[in-house]
Amino acid sequence: MSHSVPNALMTGADYLDSLRDGRQVYLNGERVADVTRHRAFRNACRSIAGLYDGLHGEQRDVLTRVDAQGRRSHRFFTPAQNAEDLLGAREAIGCWSRMTYGFMGRTPDYKAAFMSGLEAGAGFYGDYRHNACAWHRAFADRGLFLNHAIINPPLDRSKAIHEMRDVFVHVERETDQGIVVSGAKMLATGSAITNATFVAPVASAQMEAGKAEDFAVVFFARMDNPGLRLMCRPSYEERASSPFDYPLSSRFDENDSVLLFDKALIPWEDVLVYRDLRRATGFYAESGFANLYNFQSGIRLGVKLELMIGLLSLGVRANGTQSFRGIQAALGELIALQHLLQALTTAMARDPERNAAGSAVPRLEYANALRIQVPQIWKRVRELLESALGGAPLVTVSGAADLRDGEARRLVDSYYRGAELEPEQRLKLFKLIWDATGSEFGARHAVYESHYSGNAEQIRLDSLAWASRRGHLAYCEAMVQRCMADYDIHGWLRGPWQHD
């Protein structure tokens, strides 16, 4: 029956066409006329387009399902009702992740962690609940590509939010058409090639009643908004000299940008929260976003580690060190880390809880455990590769051109062969390893995996806060009390240890 349901999800061509909307993207002092054709963005756009084409190809039934309303959508774009739905979403997320080898962290399914439950939990948004429903329907039906920008620029953290009106996103005024906002938000990873960006305060934002209401807004910013500009960091894709030299940078660079709103009119239909301190940050807990984005990210990172396992295994074989005991131990540890992620995401799917709207979401305790482990895992992955491979990834030629030049190629063929690989294949392998770990693209991924979920202290403080609210900390303390109640200064008071 599912094969007969119309598929309104975007194709790759639809997605590319949706980006040609006059958005104001700035790079290297110039406005980018068309991100789909500019050499700084075009391959990243094509990578995402490939995901959308997957929704219509051989993997369609892995990636999509028909929901209760008879609409076909990506399996992670609509709320799950049970563990079976979450397991299906897990397969869909993994399928998309393998198309980018886990190296695109903000693919369209990332923001689905929030958007999937927006309609089911629309009541939370009060007067704006109809906007929540409409946005979810458009998101799920078309498979829109959304990102978010929730961080204020770190200019002077000694000041309260309301004291930074000249920089932070805030409401200037309201009109019959909507709200007029100005200010900056970051870090808008990939927003230059998305359909819209979700803008909100960060969950830990401290906003003072009577002073910060203008900052307590949550809305969607369409990328063609005349009052919105994106200032992009340098493009690794643009700098990539060839696919041979930079096989990851050249196609998976999710350009990070800062959103600059200059008296931008946000239509009322795109507003979810307006001057409401409680709702402006309360939606994080209500929506199950923390439960779900960690689920998506953990699955993606597990796929990324599959690639890293293969890179380490082939790399040590090329070096002829695969039989060394320490090398084998490093590879074994890397495999165990990938299995740890797989086990966590399996538990998150098979043992869910219910969010405020009644949908099945991964258990928060498991999501939090993964959230804390991810930065440590990726740091350890890099350490293992650097230790096991040493300087081998640096022993390469300057570029693919050296393999096309007759005299240079003769020298390469003589001196660059590996234990099991011909020179060209050895160089190809180690350039891939370098791009994954040591290039500017690789270094950016080290920063991303360490910080996309929050700073190291905050994620641990969240763990403590959640354990306190949910009673787990009290349960652990009560266990100590039970243990100490077994005995006193005179001996055993109860249990099997008592004896005459």
UniProtKB/Swiss-Prot annotation:
Domain of life (superkingdom): Bacteria
Alphabetical list of Pfam families matching this protein: HpaB (PF03241), HpaB_N (PF11794)
Taxon lineage: Bacteria, Pseudomonadati, Pseudomonadota, Gammaproteobacteria, Pseudomonadales
Any GO MF annotation of the entry: oxidoreductase activity, acting on the CH-CH group of donors
Gene Ontology process terms (BP): pyoverdine biosynthetic process
Record keywords, A-Z: FAD, Flavoprotein, Oxidoreductase
Name of the protein in question: Pyoverdin chromophore biosynthetic protein PvcC
Cofactor(s) needed: FAD
PANTHER family given in the database record: 4-HYDROXYPHENYLACETATE 3-MONOOXYGENASE-RELATED
Pathway of action: Siderophore biosynthesis; pyoverdin biosynthesis
Listed Gene3D superfamilies: 4-hydroxybutyryl-coa dehydratase, domain 1 (1.10.3140.10), Butyryl-CoA Dehydrogenase, subunit A, domain 2 (2.40.110.10), Butyryl-CoA Dehydrogenase, subunit A, domain 3 (1.20.140.10)
Organism listed in the record: Pseudomonas aeruginosa (strain ATCC 15692 / DSM 22644 / CIP 104116 / JCM 14847 / LMG 12228 / 1C / PRS 101 / PAO1)
